[in-house]
Regions:
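Catalytic histidine neighborhood in serine/cysteine hydrolases
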Residues: 28-30, 153-159
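Conserved alpha/beta-hydrolase "acid-adjacent" motif
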Residues: 14-16, 141-147
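Short beta-strand/loop motif that positions the catalytic acidic residue
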Residues: 127-129, 133-136, 140
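Active-site nucleophile loop of the alpha/beta-hydrolase fold
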Residues: 34-37, 90-100
Length: 159
């Protein structure tokens, strides 16, 4: 049975939504639910916990990570604490910083350390896995296309 390390969006579970769909397709899931006690931790502690788990249990070329929305944000912060992840990574609708309400006609949001990922990418200091892809819908208001395209160009991650 193939195993996937899953990081769902904020408030996400491994047994619902994307996690449930992957389990229904025969995948074994590990990862972090982004709710409960884990969600209450400061971002640096969340990123450290994820980095430690990946290095201890998923550190090989055959490993697979799927990170969705805020889970992708957590993965990228964890990635900044370790060498390039050796496996395959799929980032779905990744949050990579703040989104302002005026540009989208909806309420905006700003995750903790909202500008850090783009700042590291612009400096060429953001470590990314060799096998990483970003997939996002054209109308996903939480992932502005122009920012993701810039992020992809800066990091070499296909969008």
């Amino acid at each position: 049975v193939k195993s996937i390390y899953l990081l769902p969006g904020r408030g996400g579970s491994l047994t619902a939504g994307l996690g449930l769909a992957l389990k229904d397709r025969g995948y074994h899931l590990s990862g972090r639910e982004t709710l409960g006690d884990f969600a209450k931790l400061p971002l640096p502690y969340q990123a450290q916990a994820i980095a430690e788990e990946l290095q201890a249990e998923f550190w090989d070329k055959g490993a697979q990570v799927i990170a969705n929305s805020y889970g992708a944000y957590l993965f990228l912060f964890a990635q900044s604490l370790m060498p390039a992840f050796p496996g395959k990574v799929l980032l779905l609708s990744p949050v990579i910083g703040a989104v302002t309400g005026s540009s989208i006609g909806k309420a905006g949001f700003a995750p903790p350390y909202a500008e850090r990922l783009m700042a590291l990418a612009r400096l060429g200091e953001l470590v990314v896995p060799e096998h990483c892809e970003i997939h996002v819908g054209a109308n996903d208001w939480q992932c502005p296309a122009e920012r993701l395209i810039e992020f992809g160009h800066l990091t070499g991650v296909p969008v």
